[in-house]
Swiss-Prot record:
Keyword Cytoplasm: yes
Protein's name according to its UniProt entry: Ornithine aminotransferase
Gene3D superfamilies documented for this protein: Aspartate Aminotransferase, domain 1, Type I PLP-dependent aspartate aminotransferase-like (Major domain)
Cofactor: pyridoxal 5'-phosphate
UniProt similarity note: Belongs to the class-III pyridoxal-phosphate-dependent aminotransferase family. OAT subfamily.
Keywords, alphabetical: Amino-acid biosynthesis, Aminotransferase, Cytoplasm, Proline biosynthesis, Pyridoxal phosphate, Transferase
Length: 396
């Protein structure tokens, strides 16, 4: 049987060097546990950046995949499929929106949002042609495509890829006065993460989302929430915007929408926003394909049936409390909502992630000095306690 070192050697030989993963190969997974080719077991505390909220290979989701794969997998959007309509309805009701536009990856959904708000600005708000502006936040992460990279404040993400998309205005995260000052008659939208994931689980001040939404509403600016990582129960609410009782003008969803089994993403908004499209103005051959829709319907049902939102809230509150009790001056802050938790250190986090791997836990550093803790939401209290004891031992 092929071994870990052989797989890593093949990857390093033939793969573009655009990732720096921990030196582990995952060959099997179930629930919160993964296994390498040698049979070593690890607990997954990353959940594929919150794409595996329902746990690895959830039986209901896998059965939906198999059942649909045995019937039809792809029709393109040239024809209707029997899965797309029911999926539309499910997502529309979940988001309380009138329309949904499906894509495949989170970054594609972000690009779709950019196109939507720009066209809305021209067709509805009557902004002068090619003058629309989008406000974003420092330290955001919306993906790796050109539109997403153009919105980034990280110059390393942009290096060698210019010219960037024009009309992007960057303001500090959580700064209401900066938002007010940045809005002009040409502003189409304010796009933000309700909690910044790649920035180190960066949580805005209490009430900020609500106040920012009200500012946008007053100024006729669309409030767009990128809930690709934070949405679908991860933070102890169905959507992270729910913490401030905000229903944004547009949701951007992905990751856990496919249950960690098949990529699917979307934007959801009302007809006065998504109605700006006509046939041929946007599309995706695989977007909304029947296989993805069947998987996604099952994935959303699992979140509801197993009460994973409530589970995330309960277990997250307990774990954050425990982590805050670890006595080590190296830990500068523990913060989180639900099972979306960051442990900020005053030194690089990578060596500690490597120590946690040796102890049987898979974590990933983010923003250089933050350990991200985001296990599948199906994790048991016993497994979470086991994980905490390992984390405590490494960080003590």
């Amino acid at each position: 049987m092929i071994q870990t070192k052989d797989i890593i050697e093949l990857t390093d030989t033939y793969g573009a060097n655009n990732y720096h993963p921990l030196p582990i190969v995952i060959s099997k997974a179930e629930g919160v546990w993964v296994e390498d080719p040698e049979g070593n077991r690890y607990m997954d505390l990353l959940s594929a950046y919150s794409a595996v909220n329902q746990g690895h290979r959830h039986p209901k989701i896998i059965n939906a995949l198999i059942d649909q794969a045995n019937r039809v997998t792809l029709t393109s959007r040239a024809f209707h499929s029997d899965q797309l309509g029911p999926w539309y309805e499910k997502v529309a009701k979940l988001t309380n929106k009138e329309m949904v536009l499906p894509m495949n990856t989170g970054a594609e959904a972000v690009e779709t949002a950019i196109k939507t708000v720009r066209r809305w600005a021209y067709d509805v708000k009557k902004v002068e042609a090619n003058r629309a502006e989008i406000i974003v936040c420092e330290d955001n992460f919306h993906g790796r495509t050109m539109g997403s990279v153009s919105m980034s404040s990280n110059e390393e993400y942009k290096r060698g890829f210019g010219p960037m998309l024009p009309g992007i205005v960057v303001i500090p995260y959580g700064d209401l006065e900066a938002l007010k000052a940045a809005i002009t008659p040409n502003t189409a939208a304010f796009i933000l993460e309700p909690i910044q994931g790649e920035a180190g689980i960066n949580i805005p001040p209490a009430g900020y989302l609500k106040e920012a939404f009200e500012v946008c509403k007053k100024e006729n600016v669309l409030f767009v929430a990128d809930e690709i990582q934070t949405g679908l129960s991860r933070t102890g609410k169905v959507f992270a915007c729910d913490w401030d009782n905000v229903t944004p003008d547009m949701y951007i969803l992905g990751k856990a929408l496919g249950g960690g089994v098949f990529p699917i993403s979307c934007v959801a908004a009302n007809r006065d926003i998504l109605g700006v499209f006509e046939p041929g103005s946007h599309g995706s051959t695989f977007g909304g394909n029947p296989l993805a829709c069947a998987v996604s319907i099952a994935a959303l049902e699992v979140l509801e049936e197993e009460k994973l939102t409530e589970r995330s809230l309960q277990l997250g509150e307990k774990l954050v409390g425990q982590l805050k009790e670890i006595d080590n001056p190296m830990i500068t802050e523990v913060r989180g909502k639900g099972l979306f938790i960051g442990i900020e250190l005053n030194e690089p986090a990578r060596p500690y992630c490597e120590q946690l791997k040796a102890a049987g836990l898979l974590c990933k550093e983010t923003h250089e000095n933050v350990i991200r803790i985001a296990p599948p939401l199906v994790i048991s209290e016993e497994d979470l306690e086991w994980a905490f004891q390992k984390i405590k031992a490494v960080l003590s």
